[in-house]
């Protein structure tokens, strides 16, 4: 019964769509469609499966909303969706879409641990 409730909650979280006010207008994205957020020139670039969009949000605000969907900060300018990480080599994170994102030295140990924990939980659920 409890596992069924958790599964329903996970499904509801996956189906959640978020509206973003961007320079192109309002767009809606599911968390799984977002590869990462990048802070650049006082704006946030939303890198997604539907393209790149520029919006006026803070990374702190986005992290608070998206950390429950397995988003983590690899660098002061990046928040990544752990689902879309292909591999980590040194201080470079290779994303499934082909982008390479930096991993800050001071965040490396904690980020790699969180990624490892995420992978462990993903394999247990299968």
Over which residues does each language-model region extend?
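Conserved binding/recognition cores within well-folded domains
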Residues: 2-96, 100-102
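C-terminal structural segments of small proteins and small subunits
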Residues: 100-105, 109-112
């Amino acid at each position: 019964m409890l596992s069924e409730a958790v599964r329903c909650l996970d499904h509801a979280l996956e189906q959640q769509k978020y509206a973003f006010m961007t320079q192109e207008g309002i767009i809606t994205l599911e968390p799984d469609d977002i590869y990462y957020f990048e802070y650049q020139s006082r704006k946030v670039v939303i890198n997604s499966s539907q393209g790149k969009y520029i919006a006026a949000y803070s990374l702190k605000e986005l992290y608070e909303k998206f950390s429950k969907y397995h988003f983590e900060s690899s660098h002061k300018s990046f928040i990544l969706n752990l689902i879309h990480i292909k591999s980590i080599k040194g201080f470079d994170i290779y994303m499934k879409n082909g982008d390479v994102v930096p991993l800050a030295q001071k965040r490396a140990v904690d980020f790699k641990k969180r990624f490892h924990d995420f992978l462990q939980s993903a394999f247990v659920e299968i």
